Amino acid sequence: MEKINLVWLKRDLRLTDHAPLQAALTSGRPTLLLYLFEPMLLGDAHYSERHWRFVWQSLQAINRDLAQSKGEVLIVTSDWQTCFARIAERYAIEAIYSHQEVGLACTFQRDLALAQWCQQHDIVWHEFPYAAVIRGAQTRKNWDEHWQQVMRSPCCDPDLTRANWLKLDAATLGLRSDIPATWQSKQAGMQTGGSDMAWATLEDFFARRGREYYRSISSPSLARHACSRMSPYLAWGNISLREMYQTLLKHWSVAGFRRSLIALSSRLHWHCHFIQKFESECEMEFRCVNRAYDSLLQQSSDAPAAQLAAWQTGHTGIPLVDACMRCLIQTGYLNFRMRAMLVSVLTHHMNVDWRAGVTYLAQLFLDFEPGIHYPQFQMQAGVTGTNTIRIYNPTKQAQEHDSEGQFIHKWVPELAQVPVPLLFEPWLMTPLEAQMYQVPLESPYLKPVMDLEASAKQARDRLWQWQKLPAVQAEAMRILARHVRQAKPRTSPRQPNKRQPEMD
């Protein structure tokens, strides 16, 4: 049988800075590019149609770029066992090339099974690191230096002109390749996948949008324009983190951009930091990273189904909370501060275990990245024992970051006639005012699902009491030893600690 290479695309849907593809093409053997829509992931609670639409769009962009070199990605709906076995019936798979995936437990178990299958079939599986993430790292010793070295190294750009492509179709293998029609049509308000869209978005940021980045990052309205908007393209690998970082460095001296680029550079570093954290302790998909909190969370309430549904659909009666959730449902995007607020409302004000909302928000975030999602969710829920407890006040957030009410008015049309500042606390309206501003007396905005002031006090008392417990503090020391680099001696006693930035 003819010997071939197989390049398995997963969350690296691009043709540039792609070490697995570069290595496969260098070997000279016929190379098959493969993407699997795995039933295991299609049915996983973290994913929804918006993710697979974005993946489909990304694959179509790759195939457009491959047309000139007469290549094509084989796109199949199948589990890996069936697909690889069908290919192995026709060809001798000499080697499989892919990026390491810092993913959910189900993908890790899949990879363990694949490694065993490769060993049984005498197939070499070449896995390449994701960005600067170190597989199995137990400490952060020299991690920052490693990050800089990786990010400043030359990109691994495959020479597609010399590619020896192997083209197969799913029918030949007796496999499915049908794609739902809903994946093939764009959804209004949702970003479109593909490397071409990634680069266009990045270039637009450096050309004009990015000047206001550092001052607009907290506003749910302004952030939609001024933030990089690169998160889904990084999450699905339409562009590599290194490509984005090196492009940022090229613009470092552009007038008017320095403060924004310093802020963005910091966030690219934190991007890898959180994924490394998940890689080093992936059990946090199921338990609190600070294990002492698991028994404490048994005291959390099971929110009434109606209350949880109100949070999920954006009908809590808290204007900014509802506006944010409805925006997220419609567009797949929300700036970091508002995401944190949604988690705080669920876990603090409603006193619900973070696990009750973690997969739901994953379904909504177009940029869902397991390695960022779980550490961030737990940090905002206040169950790490190492981070500052942040209990968000939605009214205060609205007053500060939507001061004219534009965002709320757009996403909560029920309050279109309500003026500022009453818009931020509509439950203070008198019946006469409600009638004047066309708010029905049965509206949740006159009687929200929670009392923000009372619930915040209860959460504050609860969380601070927990954080002082010896078991929580002991776990916190373990977490710091594993996930945080040792601080260098301060040159001045007044030098401040680094604060974690907002991540958008």
Curated annotation (Swiss-Prot):
PROSITE patterns: DNA_PHOTOLYASES_1_1, PHR_CRY_ALPHA_BETA. Binds 1 FAD per subunit. The keyword Flavoprotein applies. Keywords: Chromophore, FAD, Flavoprotein. Its cofactor is FAD; (6R)-5,10-methylene-5,6,7,8-tetrahydrofolate. Residues 483-504 are annotated as: Disordered. It comes from the Bacteria. The keyword Flavoprotein applies. It holds the Pfam family DNA_photolyase. GO terms for biological process: nucleobase-containing compound metabolic process; response to light stimulus; response to stress. Residues 3-133 form the Photolyase/cryptochrome alpha/beta domain. GO terms for molecular function: deoxyribodipyrimidine photo-lyase activity; DNA binding; FAD binding. Belongs to the DNA photolyase class-1 family. Has no photolyase activity. This is Cryptochrome-like protein cry2. It comes from Vibrio cholerae serotype O1 (strain ATCC 39315 / El Tor Inaba N16961). The gene is cry2.
